[in-house]
Each structure stands twice: as structure tokens, then as C-alpha cells.
């Protein structure tokens, strides 16, 4: 008999939204990880992915699954996900050693009806893109607020995150506004705890560019990517296989690329 907690009898958390996030993440792990045949797992960042790592840690402690999960190697997308991996007793490794990942889990800032994503609100978009595109299967977990009724840019109003080389940020801002007609293109600042721009793990800046509702994210991605000085764009195109949305009422919606 499995000692992994049954999702139907989980104790309540601090609020319904956290319950929803946990349920979405647990179901994503339960329904997608092939414990006997998969070994390299990508772990992203964000408040919902916390529960992905937690669920994998629960399987690690179950005698029925220990022999499999103890052989997993987990690839992080940043400092937060690195901590999640270690805190749950999972084995940490790097994409340098495992350039092909069996399955990756991450969150999203917004998801449209075609499973196109905006990501990068946490300023880890380059590493997130590297891990997700290196994965044979990419599964997204999020709460219902991240689900757009149609187009990207409907719910997520902070703009498309764009990682840029610091010496080119003025040029990129100019081109976003004047060539691609962004409504705004703002260098993300560090907030009250840090003077100056946010600096990514790769020592670059982030520009948040607002294009309003994005009806053709594929062409916008290509246009931004071609600008000199752009390192990576927070539009994840044709990448996600499934998205699990946790709802406030405790239910989970699943968008599947196959459907």
C-alpha cells in the first residue's frame, strides 16, 4: 500500500488558492511522471512548482517508489528551484551533465487557449527556456488566474519579459517602441531592497514590454528575438504539452496539446 498522501484526503492549507495550487501540482506529477523509465526531471520556479517538488519528495519517502525516485536527477532553473530540490531530499544536478531532460515542470505568468505562455516574471526566463526546450515533455502548473480566456496579455498586464545585454538595453528599448510598436518598454527595477535594475543569473537586464493583447505570439517572438541585444524572450511557443490549472473551488482544469 502506498504511503503517498491521497489527493482526495489532503488537509486544508491557509487559503483555497493554495489548496488549488497544490492539487494542480500533485495531479501533474501523479499523471505524468513515468517513475520506472524517466530519470532526469526539470524543476522550475514559482509558487505552484513548490508543490511539484513536494510531491516528488513524498514519492521518494514511499518504499514502493524510493528505488526509482532516489535515482532521479533534478535540473533547476534558478536559485529558488535549486533550494526546492534540496529541501525535498531530491538529487541536484545540472543541464551541463544532462542536456536532454525526460520531463520538466514549471509555472507560467499567463497561458492562452493554444498553450502559448508568457514566462519570466521571476527574471529566470533564459534558464527556464533552456530547461523547458531541453525536455522531451514540458508540463505547466498554475492557478486559475494565469489562464487567459483567449489571448496572451489579457490577464498578465506587466508585459512580455525580455532578457537583454546591459550595454544594449537602450537600443533594445528604442527598437521595441519604434519598430515593434510596444506600448511601453520598461527596464525592470530591483525594488526597495535594491537600487537599479534587476540583474538576472546571467548578469543581464530585463525589459518588460507591453504589447496589449497578443493575437500572434509566434510572429511577435520572432520579431523580438531578431533585435540586436536580446538574449531571450519570455514567450514560450509550442513548448507546453499540458497545463494544469488549480481553481479556487478545489477543482483542476487541464489543457492538453493533443485535444
UniProtKB/Swiss-Prot annotation:
Recorded catalytic activity of this chain's protein: aldehydo-D-ribose 5-phosphate = D-ribulose 5-phosphate
EC number: 5.3.1.6
Cellular location(s): Cytoplasm
Gene Ontology biological-process annotations: D-ribose metabolic process; pentose-phosphate shunt, non-oxidative branch
Keyword Protein biosynthesis (UniProt): no
Example of a GO cellular component annotation carried by this entry: cytoplasm
Keywords associated with the record: Cytoplasm, Isomerase
Cross-referenced Pfam families: Rib_5-P_isom_A
Enzyme class: isomerase
UniProt GO MF annotations: ribose-5-phosphate isomerase activity
InterPro entries in the cross-refs: NagB/RpiA_transferase-like, Ribose5P_isomerase_type_A
NCBIfam families xrefs: PRK00702.1, rpiA
PANTHER family in the record: RIBOSE-5-PHOSPHATE ISOMERASE (PTHR11934:SF0)
Protein name in UniProt: Ribose-5-phosphate isomerase
Organism of origin: Vanderwaltozyma polyspora (strain ATCC 22028 / DSM 70294 / BCRC 21397 / CBS 2163 / NBRC 10782 / NRRL Y-8283 / UCD 57-17) (Kluyveromyces polysporus)
Gene: RKI1
